[in-house]
Amino acid sequence: MKTIYKYILAGSLCVSALSSCIKDSVNQDPNNPPAVPSNMLMSGAEKWVVDNVYDVWFSGRQCLPYAQYWCQRNYTEEDRYQIRESTNNSYFNYLYMGIANLIQVERENIDPATAPGNSAYGANANQIAAAKILKVWLMDIITDTWGSVPYTDVAKLASEDVYYCKYDDQKELYGTLISELDAAVDMIDESEPAFTSGDIIYGGDASQWKKFGNSLKCRLAIHMSKVDPSWKSLIAEAVASGVFEGNEDAATYQYSASGTDYCKLYEGFYVDGRNDFTITKPFANLLMGVADNLNGKSHPWEGTRDPRADIFSPGVTKGVPYGAPSIYSAKLRAGTPNWYSTQPGHLNPDFKIPLMTYAELQFILSEYKGFSDAEFKAGIEASIDYWADAYGKSVSAADKAAYIAAVGSATAEKVAVQKYIDLWLNGTEAWTEIRRTGYPEQVLRPGEYTCEDPNDASAEPIKFTALSEVKGDIIARVKYPTNESTLNGENWKAAVAKLQDGTNNYYSKMFWDVRTSTYDHPANK
């Protein structure tokens, strides 16, 4: 029988040829539609989301370089903000496909035709809640990358006559996402499983999903700390409802060493046979306790080597200077870690990816309490323990205590810098924190010196030069993809008109970024 049904494909957010969000499929029997159990949908959604956020493209060539954790060993143009439009188009689509997949998990547990059958895989309400929480986690990454983006209309694409998605104002979108987290947490029944199988992140534990939802609410709230006084009440609500209580509560995705279900970072190096990335000089120096004398920047605990230095990049003594032209690459990478030959833990096929850690929450709570010492020090200890375990390493209690003592008491800068260190591999969140707080100051801004000239030590040092206009600061956002300008033109134009100078650029700030200069550190509301 020739019939038509609609489903979200999540290409560009409009209907047009193969890039449409609504695709018509023919020759399906409406009385016997193909059914995929909701636990399998969730498993597939989790893998799709983590695969496409933590890979060598969205993370490796964008978010991790923007946070200056790692950079390219050969071709530095992307580190200097020359973004491949093909990559930008693709990952805008891929991340929205993740949103679409999670919406489908919700629908399968709401639809009277499918919900009863899917209750065999976990309480329907708990499945909906888990999908909502992960959807908010992903949507936060999307909006903190591009700014105001489609959201409200996305869920209407397959069920209502909506073919072109408007762009939600980012400030309003944050409110929507927080409301979704509240709704998700409220519907969780901790006496029932979220999933009986298929949930790779929490193994179906509804209590853990609730803690993640509340902890994620704290993350979104702290993002707004410079612009919205309600951030404190939002965190208070989340804490009262139940947040992470230890490293065992962290939201993580465990890859497998068997078959092809391996970590995408591993794939980008060893399956694809490429040796493109290593640790940056700014991050290596931060871990090693080394000041930036070229730019006259001190180190907040100079002379103290971080125990995590040899976890993240074994034996590191220097990193690759960030933002230098590619013509210097061969000389500048000499003596820096070669991850292809000395494999760090994050390049293992079965690496456990962190979506959010307990340590991050502790740093949020320290800031919430006026930069309290107890949560600050608990965060450092938890971070060292978490990362040591994730990499199969160990740090003695004495070494942890000595490091924490050397770091000293909590300040706004120290909390921000320790949080930045813990956010390793979470490039978008670290980039968000740099834009929100202005820390770490060790992160290079365009126009600053990155290294001595390797060809002439007496010459002026080489500068970090941006290849796109960023107004002298770190990149503030990624441009909207060009596909949107053609496939969702009217909504794209309306969104661009609200950006600084009315152009699709890299320097328009997020609503929560109120810094007035490159080293401004705005106070919390």
Tell where the protein language model's regions lie, with residue ranges.
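Internal, well-ordered domain-core segments that constitute the primary functional module
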Residues: 172-246
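Bacterial Sec-dependent N-terminal signal peptides
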Residues: 1-30
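Membrane-proximal, proline-rich intrinsically disordered regions
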Residues: 21-68, 74-79, 85-86, 104, ...
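Specific register positions within alpha-helical solenoid repeats of the TPR/Sel1-like families, i.e.
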Residues: 49, 140, 144-147, 188, ...
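Conserved, well-structured interaction surfaces
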Residues: 70-152, 156-196, 351
